[in-house]
Swiss-Prot record:
This is DNA-directed RNA polymerase subunit Rpo10. Keywords: Cytoplasm, DNA-directed RNA polymerase, Metal-binding, Nucleotidyltransferase, Transcription, Transferase, Zinc. Part of the RNA polymerase complex. It comes from Caldivirga maquilingensis (strain ATCC 700844 / DSM 13496 / JCM 10307 / IC-167). The keyword Ribonucleoprotein does not apply.
Length: 67
């Protein structure tokens, strides 16, 4: 839902790489090539960025609780 700040497995900081990765992939570049250019070489880190799905906009309306 929210972009992971660190890799779940090794703990490497990844939050700063999400926007460049997403923008380049949406522009039509190959995700593997983008990760190589961003120097993301570990399988665990690549998996964290590749498998992330942004659902925050769909979940936000359900988080409001009125009293």
């Amino acid at each position: 839902m929210i972009v992971p700040i660190r890799c779940w497995t090794c703990g490497r900081p990844l939050g700063h790489l999400w926007e460049p990765f997403r923008n380049r992939v949406l522009a039509g570049e190959d995700p593997g090539k983008v990760l190589d250019d961003l120097h993301v070489t570990r399988y665990c880190c690549r998996r964290t960025l590749l498998a992330h799905v942004e659902l925050i906009n769909q979940v936000l309306p359900y988080g409001l609780i009125e009293k």
